[in-house]
C-alpha cells in the first residue's frame, strides 16, 4: 500500500510482498523530478465480489467453504478502481503535495512525518465501522474487534506514559486536540465558569480561552470566562508570581498549563500549588511535547496534574487524533472518568474514528521502544543546536533558548516581522510559520517566527545539519529585509504582490537559496510514503 496516496490496494495489509516505489535510497542526488517517491503503481481495477473475492482487492478466495453461486456482472454494485482511475484530479494534488513535502525543509513545530505502519492502519477497513460508545458498551453490533482495538490502544497509551491503570484512565476517541480540550471543559465546568490559560501572544493556544478587547475569538472564551496569564517579558519565562496573584483574585475553576509556542518546561509543582490554593483543577495540554514526555526528555506533567490532554500527530508521530488522560480518584468532588467519557460521547462527538485509533495504537507501541526515546533525544539536541547557531547569527530568541522541540525567534530587533519572513522562506522551500511574540500588537503581522525540529529529525537530520538549517534561515531573512526596503508600499499585501511579481529584483537570490535547500533536503528520506 502506498499509504499517502492510496495508489494501490490494501495489499500491504493483507498479503506479503514489498510495494515498489515506497522506499528511499539512503542518499539521493539533487532532483528535478520526484522520481523515487512519486512512482505510483497503477494496478488493474479491483472488481468487487461478494463471495469469491475479497471486497478490498482481488485476493484468493477464502478457505471457508461457500455455496457455488454464480453472480452476473449486473449484480455487482460497483467496480472498485484505484484513485488514479477514479479521480486523477485528486491524485495529482496528492502527488504535488508529496513532492512539496519531499523537497521542503519542514520546520513547522506542530508537524511531523508519521510511519508507514501508522499510514496502513489509518487507511484500513477500520474506517468502515461505526462504534458509538466505549468498549463493551456500544450502540451498534459487530464491534468485537473494534473493542479489542480500542482497549489495546488505551492500554498502550497508559504504558507509553508509565501510568498505573488503577490510578489513571484515558479516552482515545477525541478527534484532535482542541476537541479534547473542549471535552474537558464540558466535563468539569459549567457555562461561564472561570479558566486561566497562557495568553496566545505569549505562546498559548486558541483553545485555552483566547480573546481580544473586541472579540471572544475562541469558543472557549465564548462559553467560559477566561483570564490569561503571561510570560515575564524580560526573561521569556512564565511569570508564576503574577499567575499566583491573578489566580488569587480571579478564582478560576481550571488552570491550564501547556502551550503552542513556549520553548521551556512548565513548573508543574508551582502550578499545582497555585491551583490548590484556589481550589482549581490543573490540566496540562501536552499536545506539542507528548512524544518528549513519553521519552522522559522533558518534565513529566502526570505527577502534578489532574487531567492531561494531547494531540497524537506532533512529536508523538501518530495519526491526527487526540487523547484525554484523567485521574480515577474523584477530584474536587468530580468523578473525572465518568465526566470525561460522557463529555466525549454523547456530549460532543458521535462515533469515533476507528481508523485513527488503529493508527494511534501502532504509534503508542513504537513510543515504548528504545528507538523512540533515542529519536526524542535527537529532537531536543537538534533544537538546541539550531538555537545556539541562531544566537551566533544575531537572532533574539524568546527565553534565550529551548528545553524542548521548538524555538521562538523575535524578529522585531531587526526591524522585521514574521509574515514577510515566512513568505520569502516559503518561496525558498523553507516551511515555518509566523508567530506572535510577547508584546505583539498584530496576530496577522506578528513579530516572530516559530521553528521546530521534530519533522526534519524524523527525516534523519543531525545537529550539524541543523546548523546548516540556521544558515539557510539567516540568508532568507537577509533577502526579506532587502525586499522590504525595495517594496513600493508598507503594507503586507504590497510586499506579497511585489515579491511574487516577475519584476522582483531579488528573485534570482531566492531561486538560488531554493535550489540549495532542495538539494540539501532531498538527501533525506521521508518515512511512511
UniProtKB/Swiss-Prot annotation:
Pathway named in the protein's UniProt entry: One-carbon metabolism; tetrahydrofolate interconversion
Subunit structure: Homotetramer.
Protein name: Serine hydroxymethyltransferase 3, chloroplastic
Compartment annotation: Plastid, Chloroplast
Pfam families listed in its UniProt record: SHMT (PF00464)
Organism encoding this protein: Arabidopsis thaliana (Mouse-ear cress)
Coiled coil feature spans: none
The encoding gene: SHM3
Catalytic EC class: transferase
A GO CC term attached to the entry: plastid
Inhibition and activation profile: Inhibited by 5-CH3-H4PteGlu1/5 and 5-HCO-H4PteGlu1/5 in vitro.
Amino acid at each position: 500500500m502506498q499509504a499517502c496516496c492510496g495508489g494501490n490496494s490494501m495489499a500491504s495489509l493483507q498479503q506479503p510482498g514489498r510495494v515498489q516505489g515506497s522506499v528511499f535510497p539512503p542518499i539521493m542526488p539533487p532532483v528535478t523530478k520526484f522520481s523515487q517517491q512519486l512512482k505510483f503503481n497503477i494496478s488493474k481495477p479491483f472488481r468487487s465480489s461478494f463471495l469469491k473475492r475479497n471486497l478490498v482487492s482481488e485476493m484468493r478466495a477464502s478457505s471457508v467453504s461457500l455455496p457455488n453461486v454464480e453472480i452476473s456482472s449486473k449484480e455487482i454494485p460497483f467496480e472498485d478502481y484505484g484513485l488514479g482511475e477514479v479521480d486523477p484530479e485528486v491524485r495529482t494534488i496528492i502527488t504535488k503535495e508529496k513532492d512539496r513535502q519531499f523537497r521542503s525543509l519542514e520546520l513547522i513545530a506542530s508537524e511531523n512525518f508519521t510511519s508507514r505502519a501508522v499510514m496502513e492502519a489509518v487507511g484500513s477497513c477500520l474506517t468502515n465501522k461505526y462504534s458509538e460508545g466505549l468498549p463493551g458498551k456500544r450502540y451498534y453490533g459487530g464491534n468485537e474487534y473494534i473493542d479489542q482495538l480500542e482497549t489495546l490502544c488505551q492500554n498502550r497509551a497508559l504504558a507509553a506514559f508509565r501510568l498505573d491503570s488503577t490510578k489513571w484512565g484515558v479516552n482515545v476517541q477525541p478527534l484532535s486536540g482542541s476537541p479534547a480540550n473542549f471535552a474537558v471543559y464540558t466535563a468539569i465546568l459549567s457555562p461561564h465558569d472561570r479558566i486561566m490559560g497562557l495568553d496566545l501572544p505569549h505562546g498559548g493556544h486558541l483553545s485555552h480561552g483566547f480573546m481580544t478587547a473586541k472579540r471572544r475569538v475562541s469558543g472557549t472564551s465564548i462559553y467560559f470566562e477566561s483570564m490569561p496569564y503571561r510570560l515575564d517579558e524580560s526573561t521569556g519565562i512564565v511569570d508564576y508570581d503574577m499567575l499566583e496573584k491573578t489566580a488569587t483574585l480571579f478564582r478560576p475553576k481550571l488552570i491550564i498549563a501547556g502551550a503552542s509556542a513556549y520553548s521551556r518546561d512548565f513548573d508543574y509543582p508551582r502550578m499545582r500549588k497555585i491551583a490548590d490554593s484556589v481550589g482549581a483543577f490543573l490540566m496540562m495540554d501536552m499536545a506539542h511535547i507528548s512524544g518528549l514526555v513519553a521519552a522522559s526528555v522533558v518534565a513529566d506533567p502526570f505527577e502534578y496534574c489532574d487531567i492531561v490532554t494531547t494531540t497524537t500527530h506532533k512529536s508523538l508521530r501518530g495519526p491526527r487524533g487526540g487523547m484525554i488522560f484523567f485521574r480515577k480518584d474523584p477530584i474536587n468532588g468530580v468523578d473525572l472518568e465518568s465526566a470525561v467519557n460522557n463529555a466525549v460521547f454523547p456530549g460532543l462527538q458521535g462515533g469515533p474514528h476507528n481508523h485513527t485509533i488503529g493508527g494511534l495504537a501502532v504509534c503508542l507501541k513504537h513510543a515504548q521502544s528504545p528507538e523512540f526515546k533515542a529519536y526524542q533525544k535527537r529532537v531536543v539536541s537538534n533544537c538546541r543546536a539550531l538555537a545556539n547557531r541562531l544566537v551566533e547569527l544575531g537572532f533574539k530568541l524568546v527565553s534565550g533558548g529551548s528545553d524542548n522541540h521548538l524555538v521562538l525567534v523575535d524578529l522585531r530587533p531587526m526591524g522585521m516581522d514574521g509574515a514577510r519572513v515566512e513568505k520569502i522562506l516559503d518561496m525558498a522551500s523553507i516551511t515555518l510559520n509566523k508567530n506572535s511574540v510577547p508584546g505583539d500588537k498584530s496576530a496577522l503581522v506578528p513579530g516572530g517566527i516559530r521553528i521546530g525540529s521534530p519533522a526534519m529529525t524524523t527525516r534523519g537530520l543531525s545537529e550539524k545539519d541543523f546548523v546548516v538549517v540556521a544558515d539557510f534561515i539567516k540568508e532568507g531573512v537577509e533577502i526579506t529585509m532587502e525586499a522590504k526596503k525595495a517594496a513600493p508600499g508598507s503594507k503586507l499585501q504590497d510586499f506579497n504582490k511585489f515579491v511574487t511579481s516577475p519584476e522582483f529584483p531579488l528573485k534570482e537570490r531566492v531561486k538560488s537559496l531554493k535550489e540549495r535547500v532542495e538539494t540539501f533536503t532531498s538527501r533525506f528520506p521521508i518515512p511512511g510514503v
